Curated annotation (Swiss-Prot):
InterPro entries to which the protein is assigned, alphabetical: BAG2 (IPR037689), BAG_domain (IPR003103)
Domain BAG: 109-189
Function statement: Co-chaperone for HSP70 and HSC70 chaperone proteins. Acts as a nucleotide-exchange factor (NEF) promoting the release of ADP from the HSP70 and HSC70 proteins thereby triggering client/substrate protein release.
SMART domains with a match to the protein in the record: BAG
List of residues that carry Phosphoserine: S20, S31, S73
Gene: BAG2
Name the UniProt record assigns to this protein: BAG family molecular chaperone regulator 2
Species in which this protein is naturally found: Bos taurus (Bovine)
Location of N-acetylalanine modifications: A2
Coiled coil regions, renumbered to chain: 20-61
């Protein structure tokens, strides 16, 4: 009888310990789940800061190279450039780095995609129009919407092989490059228009002298 009571108490102790361990494990797992949400929120916030830095630098650069900047006095332009350079310097002091975990295959796909974009960029000065068309086909390959133009199928398959975060970065880079080309094209047209207007004025002045 005494032996039975001892065995019952031993079994009860084992049950209590097992139940207690399960509770601890459950609490620890719940804590880790909550921490995982905070880690993802941290990465998203850091990525947002990284993107905001890129946007700010692009906007400052755009202002410095705008047509309005060319149509003000030298003194005003110098003062505004000093302010723009100061803002750019302060922006560059913000260092944010969000590392992407990649498999060897994803790493290789990213290198391949980056190399293709770099090759197009290197041809900007030779043929701006063709570079724009090529970039548009690359961008269409990254878009989930129905593309308006041709899609580079080979590039699309390469991008699909990249990590999701890298796919987003590739798309953002292409968007930035296309905006830069558009701004450069506008600047060239404005310059040509200014030259044409100046040439026309000179011609009219010359004709007026002869008359």
């Amino acid at each position: 009888m005494a032996q039975a009571r001892i065995s019952a108490k031993a079994n009860e102790g084992r049950f209590c310990r097992s139940s207690s361990m399960a509770d601890r494990s459950s609490r620890l797992l719940e804590s880790l789940d909550q921490l995982e949400l905070r880690v993802e929120a941290l990465r998203e916030a850091a990525t947002a800061v990284e993107q905001e830095k890129e946007v700010l630098l692009e906007m400052i650069h755009s202002i410095q190279n705008s047509q309005d900047m060319r149509q003000i006095s030298d003194g005003e332009r110098e003062e505004l450039n000093l302010t723009a350079n100061r803002l750019m310097g302060r922006t560059l002091t913000v260092e944010v780095s969000v590392e992407t975990i990649r498999s060897p295959q994803q790493q290789e796909s990213l290198k391949h995609a980056t190399r293709i974009i770099d090759e197009v960029v290197s041809k900007f000065l030779d043929d701006l129009g063709n570079a724009r068309s090529h970039l548009m086909s690359l961008y269409s390959a990254c878009s989930s919407e129905v593309p308006a133009g041709p899609v580079d199928q080979k590039f699309q398959s390469i991008v699909i092989g990249c990590a999701l975060e890298d796919q987003k970065k590739i798309k953002r880079r292409l968007e930035t490059l296309l905006r830069n080309i558009e701004n450069a094209d506008k600047a060239i047209k404005l310059l040509e228009h200014s030259k044409g207007a100046a040439s026309k004025t000179l011609q009219q002045n010359a004709e007026a002298r002869f008359n």
